[in-house]
Amino acid sequence: MTGSRIAGMVAVFVLPGIALAVVPTSAWADDTEPARPHVELSIRSWLFTNGETKWSHNASGLDPQLGNPTSKLTYKDNNSHILELSGKVNFKKDWFAQVDGGFSVAFHRGTLTDDDYSAVGGQHLFSQTTSNITGSGTQFVNADIGYHLRDYPENRGNLNVFVGYQYWRTQYEASGVTQVVCAPSGIPGLTCNPAGTISNQGQVVITNTTQWHSLRIGVQSEYLLTSRFSVEGKLAFIPASYLQNDDVHHLRQDLQQDPSFSMSGYGIGADVEAGARYMIYRGWFLNAGYRFWWNYLLDGNLTVHPVGTPSASVPLTEFQTMRYGFTLGLSHTF
């Protein structure tokens, strides 16, 4: 996303709110929100998000001619739009439960880069290909329970803590193959097409499905600058996350197709969100902000599933998933 585009969005979403924030609060005295509503329902769009999943593995333990890493795959999508619905219920004075769910409504721009390495003659890249990305995109569910920790002086806002579960799934489909780099691997039978070769146009060649199951612990806060305008933030640390990743290489007749490679492991992560909130009418709010999610593998394995021979496992050297972008939404409290 270009700097001018970001600046334009900031101007549209943030500057009107700042201007409204300086209006005297007494002018809005009749529209102030009740102290703590029982229910809040929201619809939100995660706009122009960029996503990335990348992983690599080390198969040199099976064949010392292979590099370390042996392969590195990077899936990147751009300007994907995600629709999100959420509900929050306050109960027993200081407790609340919140559920968020989202799914992609536009997901068709991106690139897969597939790098392969040889150790013959020293570690070197001998093949690089790129493919166009489509797929079902991203879906997620967050389910949290929280506690109202404190109110700020003069009823200016509050600070809450929460713990919960996050399910985050991303599926990429890579279509077509463009050979960018091809050099001698030094490994008998391991070759590539000449650089510049384009093949399998319009054909899905790889399907990759990533699933993270995560424990979240975090804090969230809202601070009122006026009776209508507030700023808010949310920070969640993920101390434990379980990864499941299936990779199907549709052109590889020597590999099984359900899946060709499977990956699993444990990691950590973080979710960060900051934004502003403006009451347009009693109980109705416009929300705008920015969000960043990240999950990172600490330890895991890749298992290859060949046809006719036993499966074999090798260590993953990297696996991480991230997504970031602006948010814009409408919420109602009652």
Language-model features: where?
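Cleavable N-terminal export/targeting peptides
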Residues: 1-38
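Short loop/turn motifs that connect adjacent beta-strands in outer-membrane beta-barrel proteins
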Residues: 30-39, 92-97, 150-159, 225-231, ...
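Transmembrane beta-barrel strands of outer-membrane/channel proteins
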Residues: 39-49, 99-105, 147, 161-169, ...
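Extracellular/periplasm-exposed beta-strand and loop segments of Gram-negative cell-envelope proteins
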Residues: 51-80, 103-141, 167-212, 239-273, ...
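Membrane-embedded beta-strands of outer-membrane beta-barrel proteins
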Residues: 85-87, 141-145, 161, 217-219, ...
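Residue-level signature of outer-membrane beta-barrel architecture
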Residues: 87-91, 147-149, 221-223, 227-229, ...
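Short, surface-exposed binding/anchoring microloops in extracellular/periplasmic proteins
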Residues: 212-215, 223-224
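Short Gly/Pro-enriched loop/turn and capping motifs at secondary-structure junctions
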Residues: 281, 291-298
